[in-house]
Amino acid sequence: MDLRQLIRDIPDYPKEGILFFDITPLLGDPDGFRRAIDLLAERFADSGATKIVAAEARGFIFGAALAYKMGLGFVPVRKPGKLPYKTVSVSYDLEYGSDTLCMHEDALLRDEKVLVIDDLLATGGTLSGVIDLVEHFGADIVGIGVVIELEFLNGKEQLRSYGCESILQIA
């Protein structure tokens, strides 16, 4: 099954000059969605992970489904003000500015084995922020998995030491 056929290209969204890769056709196709989760599960079957950490919003979709498939806990990473309990936060740089991500202060244990999942790897900014949060807890990142990697943006370079895996590469 060619998962690329289930990703819709939308030019000039959310602003002019940006090519947006829409995953909703993949999510709407039961076989395609199942295949994406199965491929991620195969890649990380021997990772030793105990938790999956994923950032909102689209990372939740794949992270939660993969956690269910692998029998692991799921930890959401959200923007400030979106989690009800006490949080730990980290600010990180984006291509044009910065942003902040938060996790509950009791979400991870020291030395816990964590798999970080997201829908798309572009420049690596968001994933770097998630990594900083996970490492704040003293947890160990045993892998990073993404559905789509935009190879032309070289985001994988800054994640090299964590073993980033993608199931679909767009050059």
Swiss-Prot record:
Pathway: Purine metabolism; AMP biosynthesis via salvage pathway; AMP from adenine: step 1/1. GO terms for cellular component: cytoplasm. Its EC number is 2.4.2.7. SUPFAM superfamilies: PRTase-like. Pfam families: Pribosyltran (PF00156). It comes from the Bacteria. Gene3D superfamilies: 3.40.50.2020. One of its GO terms (biological process) is purine ribonucleoside salvage. It catalyses: AMP + diphosphate = 5-phospho-alpha-D-ribose 1-diphosphate + adenine. One of its GO terms (molecular function) is adenine phosphoribosyltransferase activity. It is an enzyme of class 2 (transferase). Keywords: Cytoplasm, Glycosyltransferase, Purine salvage, Transferase. InterPro entries: Ade_phspho_trans (IPR005764), PRibTrfase_dom (IPR000836), PRTase-like (IPR029057), UPRTase/APRTase (IPR050054). It is found in: Cytoplasm. Catalyzes a salvage reaction resulting in the formation of AMP, that is energically less costly than de novo synthesis. Belongs to the purine/pyrimidine phosphoribosyltransferase family. Homodimer. This is Adenine phosphoribosyltransferase. It comes from Solidesulfovibrio magneticus (strain ATCC 700980 / DSM 13731 / RS-1). The gene is apt.
